[in-house]
């Protein structure tokens, strides 16, 4: 068995399988694409649709919009112990079907459940940020999780769905299921 160190994780390649196995030995860096693929294979990252080949980047995972955008009055976080789905039900003004593409209006705030969800072990956490193309379009977007008290942060051991807050600033935008506005880095 060949053993190497990468980003604070022990990498052991099983003889003959060619598949890297990852076991946390520290939390000192961002996971590479091979580790992200292993997390998908092992079920720590799941999705309602299969991942696409170009979705896994060298050190991040592009996150995809789900089927519905919920228009809300303002930005919010659920807070510790609170569920985003319940907050969405409480604060939704109306919903927008994204399956065929829909316009998200400038100056409005939307919450979109993402296709991906996580079942992270206690050794893994994550951070998120908008993709650079999203910023160039002047679309403000942040990641939210159940129980979050901070945007764009996923606590170690998080199990649950992921949501994007989207607020087009300069122009209204056309959004559809599968569009990628955020990316996530696991550590």
Model-derived features with residue positions:
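Non-catalytic terminal segments and appended small domains
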Residues: 1-187
